[in-house]
Amino acid sequence: AIGADAYERLRASDGEAVSQHSRAAFPGYLLIASFLPIIMWNGVRSWPTAIGMFALAMLMAVAAWDLTRRPHKSVGYMVGYAIGNALLIAIISRFSGPLLVVPAVFAFVTGSVVTYPTFVTRKWLLMGIMLAGFLAPIALEELGVLARTWTMTDAGVLTFGDGMELSGTPTVVTVIFASLATIVMAGLQSARVSSASRAAHHRLVLQAHQLRQLGGHVVRVQQRHREA
């Protein structure tokens, strides 16, 4: 068991980690919301899907900002946050199919959200939520509940989307931009996690060094007392 003071210090450390992490995630949701004009440039096939993506991205941005200000949330809140992420990416799959950019986005978001303290000890819960978000649209398409966004042909995988038109230069630009955005956001988030881990490791090394110095000083003082 640890004392109350140590517990509060650990809790504060977790809160700081959540704040930093959600602050890094905030621009990503705004970036997703900014795709609405790009979707309109391609040609909207489903306004409810387009508006739903924009609205949910903005809602997730608000949730991320709230986490930066009040990081100590319940498990239920964080599960809702994870479900919101999975649902947002599932909606994104309606624009270009689930096999083009979406798997990379799911991998990036899962790797990002799992670093929250709530999911460090509940990784399988998070992975279950994310896998459900990836597989649900595919299953619903197979059942005929949702319009198909892809099919397999002799030439390979044919993606045609349901939320926007997929043809011509706008679509090429959109796919490239979405891929670049995913790579950049993943790189920035990984750099943030690595930087935080490196800083924590350095603090431990310095503290261990200081303790060794203190221990050596105590030993020398004790030896002087014995010699005296």
Which residues fall in each region the model found?
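Hydrophobic transmembrane alpha-helices and their membrane-interface boundaries in multi-pass
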Residues: 21-113, 127-139
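Short, Lys/Arg-rich, polar N-terminal cytosolic tail immediately upstream
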Residues: 1-16
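Membrane-interfacial helical/loop segments at transmembrane boundaries in membrane proteins
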Residues: 145-167
